[in-house]
């Protein structure tokens, strides 16, 4: 089973994801250039962090038109797993696979830190193997990570148990402390924290490993 890692012009976390999945966990991976439309043979796809297309106009606004994402819509509809990390989460909202939007941080500056997170839902495979009573610690690095949505969308996320992670100490002003959400089916996860930067105990802890392992779990 193989994971596809999408590479956009301006991406800078695709190699990090490759190292965490293949280098640390021994998973088979394949880089997908943004112009590719062939997702055959893939179990899951990762949209990594970075600054796709320089984040001009708005984070993820240009990336959403990449040819690879047309194929991604069909991939998701067939049940394929998709993980969007940071800029990847922004792209998923622009694409309409996840509701809401990511906006400028409340204090209007870039945040780079390791933060405690609360597992808000174990409904999906992504977080089933975590102890919900314990915080996990993952790095964040973003200037536009403040999750925003309407009250009706927030209620829907709550009713569907789709809020996956919450910040314990909200660093960016996200509504309801939201750090990660899933779609109703649970096969799409968007998150601002970086699990790939917490997959090696020597360089940042291992709290992200189980999220990455879920890419290939049934």
From Swiss-Prot:
Entry-linked InterPro entries: Class_I_gatase-like (IPR029062), PRibForGlyAmidine_synth_PurQ (IPR010075)
Catalytic residue positions: 86 (nucleophile), 194, 196
Any single GO CC term annotated in Swiss-Prot or TrEMBL for this entry: cytoplasm
Catalytic activity: N(2)-formyl-N(1)-(5-phospho-beta-D-ribosyl)glycinamide + L-glutamine + ATP + H2O = 2-formamido-N(1)-(5-O-phospho-beta-D-ribosyl)acetamidine + L-glutamate + ADP + phosphate + H(+); L-glutamine + H2O = L-glutamate + NH4(+)
Task of the protein: Part of the phosphoribosylformylglycinamidine synthase complex involved in the purines biosynthetic pathway. Catalyzes the ATP-dependent conversion of formylglycinamide ribonucleotide (FGAR) and glutamine to yield formylglycinamidine ribonucleotide (FGAM) and glutamate. The FGAM synthase complex is composed of three subunits. PurQ produces an ammonia molecule by converting glutamine to glutamate. PurL transfers the ammonia molecule to FGAR to form FGAM in an ATP-dependent manner.
NCBIfam families: FGAM_synth_I, PRK03619.1
Subunit text: Part of the FGAM synthase complex composed of 1 PurL, 1 PurQ and 2 PurS subunits.
Name this protein carries in UniProt: Phosphoribosylformylglycinamidine synthase subunit PurQ
Organism annotation: Prochlorococcus marinus (strain SARG / CCMP1375 / SS120)
Gene: purQ
């Amino acid at each position: 089973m193989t994971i596809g890692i999408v590479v956009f012009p301006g991406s800078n976390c695709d190699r990090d994801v490759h190292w965490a999945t293949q280098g640390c966990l021994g998973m088979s991976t394949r880089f997908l250039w943004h112009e590719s439309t062939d997702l055959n043979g893939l179990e899951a796809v990762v949209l990594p962090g970075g600054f796709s297309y320089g984040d001009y106009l708005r984070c993820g606004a240009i990336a959403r038109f990449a040819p690879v994402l047309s194929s991604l819509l069909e991939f998701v509809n067939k049940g394929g797993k998709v993980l969007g990390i940071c800029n990847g989460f922004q792209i998923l909202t622009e694409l309409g696979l996840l509701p809401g939007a990511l906006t400028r941080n409340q204090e209007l500056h870039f945040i780079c830190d390791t933060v405690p997170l609360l597992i808000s839902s174990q409904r999906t495979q992504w977080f089933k193997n975590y102890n919900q009573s314990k915080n996990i610690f993952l790095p964040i690095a973003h200037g536009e990570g403040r999750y925003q949505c309407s009250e009706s969308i927030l209620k829907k996320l709550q009713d569907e148990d789709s809020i996956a992670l919450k910040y314990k100490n909200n660093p960016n002003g996200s509504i309801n402390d939201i750090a990660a959400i899933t779609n109703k089916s649970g096969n799409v996860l968007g998150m601002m924290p970086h699990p790939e930067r917490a997959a090696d105990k020597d360089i940042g802890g291992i709290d992200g490993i189980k999220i990455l392992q879920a890419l290939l779990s049934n």
